Amino acid sequence: MKIKDIKEGLIDSGTLIGMPALFLILPGTGEEGTKKGVDELLEAVKNSFKRYVVIAGGTIADQAEELKVLLSGIEDLYCHTVIECDGREMLDLDADLYSLSLKPRGTWPVENINAYVSAGRIVELKIYLEDEIDLRETLIALSNHNVPRSAIFFLPAGDDLESYRENAVFLSEECLKYGFRLGERLRFTLGK
């Protein structure tokens, strides 16, 4: 498998926010990665003593066959797996949680989201919102799928603490109005 990075950290947002995890970051399209065997990655998981393993990056679908073997091995180590992706590619992988990060002005993979839910996958949607236009587009898109509201997080968009806080105030009011969960992003809360 090609791996861009292996690191330990806290899960930044969503249902498992704040949980310690081992992150296996896959290279994006056109990026280089270091070739690692499944056994080597399982050893890294075992040595990390983390109960959660997050697999993220741009080439999840490209490495699906190796990931199936890796996910099975991680399960044998009694760890939970999270796949973080944008949901545009349908992945047939046995992860404990599919954490889909969405941006309203992009194309929403409604069919894939519904297919994940229909297949019994546990799915959470983390939707990064910046303004009223984002909110309107999101509310329309959400009417077309069957993810429970308890698994939908509205996350404040922002590249710095000031814009993050401004969006958090706006979103808190909208979450109250529409009944969605306001998500937090630890990197801003912790000032990292």
Regions found by a protein language model. Name each.
Residues 1, 5-11, 20-97:
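Conserved Radical SAM active-site core
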Residues 12-16, 173:
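Short secondary-structure boundary/capping segments within folded domains
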Residues 16-18, 119:
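A generic structural micro-feature
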